[in-house]
Amino acid sequence: MIRFILVILTAFLYLILSIPVLLVLLLIRKKKPEVCDKVSRSLIRWIFRVILFFSGTKITVKGQENIPKDRAVLYIGNHRSYFDILVTYTTVPGSCGFVAKKELSRIPLLKNWMELIHCLFLDRSDIKQGLQMILSGCEELKSGTSICIFPEGTRGKTESELELGAVSYTHLTLPTT
């Protein structure tokens, strides 16, 4: 319970205390997007690592040497908890955005940080918007930003171990032109 409180408190404090940095990043985003990307990515990776530390999470990555570091990758995985995002973001190379449910875009500050790290918001009830989001994701991949998606569309509800298979966690390399 103490770790849970530490995690929630850390995330909340980060969102509040990072407002000045967020405002600066939003101001420089148009003129210096590469600086904005690098700083945003570094700050989010840092806070995710802090949260993982406070939660007592130990990470073991197998096969990371198989992931290309010189181009964008589409990551596909099973969604077990919000920690999937923290673990993935802190372990994959380069810039990586996530496909997230639209409801998260309604949370002030969180939405801004998610946009800065190239997250895409999906309205699961609107097929037309879903197609537009897929096209936006393709553009992100072409521009060099990896994308992570959890195709189930929500976190797994059972405690049973997920079956290993093609969708358990994989990556797809797309050619860039």
Task: Please describe what each predicted stretch is.
Residues 54-62, 129-131:
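Short gly/ser/thr-rich secondary-structure transition/capping motifs
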Residues 72-74, 146-150:
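Residue-level preference for the first positions of well-ordered beta-strands
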Residues 65-67:
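Glycine-rich helix-loop-beta junction characteristic of Rossmann-like nucleotide cofactor-binding loops
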Residues 133, 162-168:
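Charged helix-capping and loop-helix junction motifs
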Residues 156-159:
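Short, solvent-exposed loop/turn segments at secondary-structure junctions
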Residues 2-27:
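A hydrophobic membrane-anchoring feature enriched in long, contiguous, low-charge segments
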Residues 170-176:
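Conserved small/polar residues in nucleotide/adenosyl-binding loops
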Residues 22-42, 53-54, 69-127:
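Catalytic core of membrane glycerolipid acyltransferases/transacylases, capturing the structured
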